[in-house]
Amino acid sequence: MSTDLVRFIADLSNRWRSRFSPSRPEHLRLGARGEKLACRFLRRSGYKVLYRNFRGRSGGEIDIVCRDKDTLVFVEVKTRTREDFGRPFDAIDRSKQKRIARGGLAWLRLLDDPDILFRFDVVEVIIVEDAQPRFELLRNAFALPEPYIY
């Protein structure tokens, strides 16, 4: 068995164990729940979900990769239990945008199609006790922070 395959299987196993571990911190469990709810919301909104939790080799990360008609969409999900400290979108600063952009560019490199249309969306998920989750979809929430080459 190749070393890359062994590494891939070990990484997958670690992710699986850590995702469902009962000792996982509350904020991580909340984030995972928000991503699951956001996937359902996006499907109901007509998006086709392609992948969850993509990590690029360059350190970039994408919560959800999906398609909206002919456009590839990289979605960042922000989940909160209240809005006392501003909207969830406010937590996406320039450095977070760069990390998301690196993940998106890593995905585009895998496709090897420089002419594909893409954008970055944000889904805000507000989960309040004893109420239905609330969703806000911000299409084209931000642009690439700098010119890109892939």
Where are the language model's segments positioned?
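Domain-level recognition of nuclease-like catalytic cores that cleave nucleotide substrates
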Residues: 2-4, 110-150
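Acidic-basic catalytic patches of nuclease active cores, encompassing PD-(D/E)XK
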Residues: 2-52
